[in-house]
Curated annotation (Swiss-Prot):
Name listed for the protein in its UniProt record: Elongation factor G
Disulfide bonding pattern of the chain: none
Protein role: Catalyzes the GTP-dependent ribosomal translocation step during translation elongation. During this step, the ribosome changes from the pre-translocational (PRE) to the post-translocational (POST) state as the newly formed A-site-bound peptidyl-tRNA and P-site-bound deacylated tRNA move to the P and E sites, respectively. Catalyzes the coordinated movement of the two tRNA molecules, the mRNA and conformational changes in the ribosome.
Main location: cytoplasm
Signal peptide start-end: none
SUPFAM superfamilies: EF-G C-terminal domain-like (SSF54980), P-loop containing nucleoside triphosphate hydrolases (SSF52540), Ribosomal protein S5 domain 2-like (SSF54211), Translation proteins (SSF50447)
Protein's organism: Thermotoga maritima (strain ATCC 43589 / DSM 3109 / JCM 10099 / NBRC 100826 / MSB8)
Superkingdom classification of source: Bacteria
UniProt GO MF annotations: GTP binding; GTPase activity; translation elongation factor activity
UniProt keyword list: Cytoplasm, Elongation factor, GTP-binding, Nucleotide-binding, Protein biosynthesis
Any one GO biological process: ribosome disassembly
Classification via NCBIfam families: EF-G (TIGR00484), PRK12740.1-3 (NF009379), PRK12740.1-5 (NF009381), PRK13351.1-1 (NF009891), small_GTP (TIGR00231)
Residues that hold GTP according to the record: 18-25, 82-86, 136-139
Family: Belongs to the TRAFAC class translation factor GTPase superfamily. Classic translation factor GTPase family. EF-G/EF-2 subfamily.
Length: 692
């Protein structure tokens, strides 16, 4: 058997999630470094020692270009899915979490839980992803392991169980004590690849025993049997501790906590052991749920090669050498290269010409994939992020990945004629990779408009256009993606009748529209309440299409209409003259008429802004926020810094980076993410409508 195909219980699909500066990349690099060395040292006799790809003497960062990397540790295969730490890219995190089975959450031991870590943690909660925590940077000034662990309780309401205790901290950080084995672990070689277990130093013995006691107490709370043994004062074995911890981690009832300093090459190997000990294999999780294409019935697919093939596309990348790479996670069945696969989301079959596994340093072509595998396919032309790939004989649709709607737009235009064609190709490639980037051409002005999740998101897109695709573009002022909605219900009638020689046109619709409350999370709902066949059922899709078309431009300022329920109450038809087109036009007329009566209002995107600043600038920053229609929601102290959390309209935030820099002499930083849409105050709405 090839080393690649391990049994399912020996497979781990994990992500590494973290706040931007917690040291996620370094932790990932070290994992690839040690697993690479370990794997290849072990396999010399198989003749695959082609591995001097990481020059030991040079500390060079492997930034994982790939969305998924595979590595081996002690006979287990670990697939690592890359998740970015910046909030403008929450969509990337969402899609990675969908296909993960577990995660390592990396924290900076000097800060514990930081604002972005909360966002990512909540997303992981949404998908019930089991986690272990790694307190990194134990060698940094201000590192405090137990303070950092406490923030998991206060900020994330998690149940952390430290299974290690640090030996020293800051510049005296030397290693860790394993509280399960009660051994001290020291790293001996400079590159951290050699480490040894020793007895716990005498001066730390007492504290270690106290910390072990705390750990056992928490573990006893998770399991009746262990509780009895614990209360009786009986010895609890290493196997029992790990069994209970594993079960609790997989059920999201506990988070084992480890510590180390990735940059100083300490703590990584025990972290890999913890991935194997506590995080789930595909067999530990419930089967994936989907909907049968033929009748919408719920079906489940088990991680079994004999089940029909089912996979989810979670990322598309354009590789300069092999073209479009479609990354997917296999949930059930088996797929051979060169065979056909059915994309049930698009309703098309495609041929997968090659299948590759990504290693940190190379691509490995494989003949087939099985359940639990994370691979990239070549030759899939229509497949996009969120699509389901399956067996054409048993089509199924997995839950789609929900991406937030873009909130900000920019006009981009090519500088020269030569750039024009390149721009179209480049934007097509980028929007395939990133589902939160939308591209459209403005009908009236002919401008190309790109829309995304924030200023930074679009800056990066423009930067990539220049750097990767060599397209020079001019960029317009950022524009806010306003929306329109209604505040009350209204009814209206639409009649479209044309009598000109030959066949006429006849469509007649009576509609009611009503507001959908924001908490329902729906932008549109269509209900047919007609009775007695006043309008034949076959015209209903045309009526819905007419309404949707009318919703593209609202009555106030031509912005898209959201949060509206349209109910068809009545109408009439003509045996000969009625057609789909006539009903589409009549429905559109009725909707536009009803909108005018339903008290239409403008909505604007509100952003959540988190600013971290030295205390002396706080007053100026807050008074500036007040001038931007912001609502300050909380102020907290983190070390010697203040954290301000506020909600502020997107339209008031353009260029905020520069403003904040000058207010704080470059010492404050901020992160911003979309929060919700809210009604624009009347005075401001009037100005916006005037401009349009």
């Amino acid at each position: 058997m090839e080393a690649r195909y391990v049994d399912l219980d020996k497979l781990r699909n994990i992500g590494i999630m973290a706040h931007i500066d917690a040291g996620k990349t370094t932790t990932t690099e070290r994992i690839l470094y040690y697993t690479g060395r370990k794997h290849f040292i072990g396999d010399v006799d198989e003749g695959n020692t082609t591995t001097d790809w990481m020059p030991q003497e040079k500390e060079r960062g492997i930034t994982i270009q790939s969305a998924a990397t595979t590595c081996f540790w002690k006979g287990y295969r670990i697939n690592i899915i890359d998740t970015p730490g910046h909030v403008d890219f929450t969509a990337e995190v969402e899609r990675a979490l969908r296909v993960l089975d577990g995660a390592i959450a990396v924290f900076d031991a000097t800060a514990g839980v930081e604002p972005q870590s909360e966002t990512v943690w909540r997303q992981a909660d949404k998908y019930n992803v089991p986690r272990i925590a790694f307190m990194n940077k134990m060698d940094k000034v201000g590192a405090d392991f137990y303070m950092a662990v406490e923030t998991l309780v206060t900020k994330l309401r998690a149940n952390p169980i430290p299974v290690q205790m640090p030996i020293g901290s800051e510049k005296d950080f030397q290693g860790v004590i394993d509280l399960i084995k009660m051994k001290a672990i020291y790293w001996v070689s400079e590159d951290g690849s050699v480490y040894e277990e020793r007895d716990i130093p005498e001066e730390l013995r007492e504290e270690a025993e106290m910390r072990r006691e705390e750990m056992l107490e928490k573990i006893a709370e998770l399991d009746e049997e262990i509780l009895e043994k614990y209360l009786e004062g009986e010895e609890i074995s290493e196997e029992e501790i790990k069994r209970v911890l594993r079960k609790a981690t997989i059920e999201n009832k506990a988070v084992p906590v480890l510590c180390g300093a990735a940059k100083a090459n300490k703590g990584i190997q025990p972290l890999l052991d913890a991935v194997i000990d506590y995080l789930p294999s595909p067999l530990d999780l419930p089967p994936v749920k989907g909907w049968r294409v033929s009748d919408g019935e719920v079906v489940y697919r088990k991680p079994d090669e004999n089940e029909p093939f089912t996979a989810l596309v979670f990322k598309v990348q354009v590789d300069p050498y092999i073209g479009k790479l479609v990354y997917f996670r296999v949930y059930s069945g088996r797929l051979e290269k060169g065979s056909y696969v059915y994309n049930s989301t698009k309703g098309q079959r495609e041929r997968i010409s090659r299948i590759v596994f990504m290693h940190a340093d190379k691509r490995e072509e494989v003949d087939y994939v099985r359940p639990g595998d994370i691979a990239a396919g070549v030759g899939l032309k229509v497949s996009q992020t969120g699509d389901t790939l399956c067996d054409e004989k048993e089509p199924i649709i997995l839950e789609k990945i929900d991406f937030p709607e873009p909130v900000i737009s920019l006009a981009v235009e090519p500088v020269t004629k030569a750039d024009e064609e390149k721009l179209v190709k480049a934007l097509l490639a980028l929007s395939e990779e990133d589902p939160t980037l939308q591209v459209r051409v403005d009908k009236e002005t002919g401008e190309t408009i790109i829309s995304g999740m924030g200023e930074l998101h679009l800056e990066i897109v423009v930067d990539r256009l220049k750097r990767e695709f060599g397209v020079n573009v001019r960029v317009g002022q950022p524009q806010v993606a306003y929306r329109e909605t209604i505040k009350k219900s209204a009814e209206a009638e639409g009649k479209y009748i044309r009598q000109t020689g030959g066949r006429g046109q006849y469509g007649h619709v009576i509609l009611r529209i009503e507001p959908i409350p924001e908490e329902e999370g729906k932008n549109f709902e269509f209900i047919d309440k007609t009775v007695g066949g006043v309008i034949p059922k076959e015209f209903m899709p045309a009526i819905e299409a007419g309404i949707k078309e009318a919703m593209m431009a609202g009555p106030l300022a031509g912005y898209p209409v959201v949060r509206v329920r349209a109910i068809v109450l009545d109408g009439s038809y003509h045996e000969v003259d009625s057609s789909e087109m006539a009903f589409k036009i009549a429905a559109s007329m009725a909707f536009k008429e009803a909108m005018k009566k339903a008290q239409p209002v403008l909505l604007e995107p509100i952003m959540k802004l988190e600013i971290t600043t030295p205390e002396e600038y706080m007053g100026n920053i807050i008074s500036d926020l007040n001038s931007r229609r912001a609502k300050v929601e909380s102020l907290e102290t983190r070390g010697h810094l203040k954290v301000i959390v506020a909600k502020v309209p997107l339209s008031e935030t353009f260029g905020y980076a520069t403003v904040l820099r000058s207010l704080s002499q470059g010492r404050a930083s901020y992160i911003m993410q979309f929060s919700h849409y809210q009604e624009v105050p009347e005075k401001i709405a009037e100005k916006i409508i005037k401009v349009v």
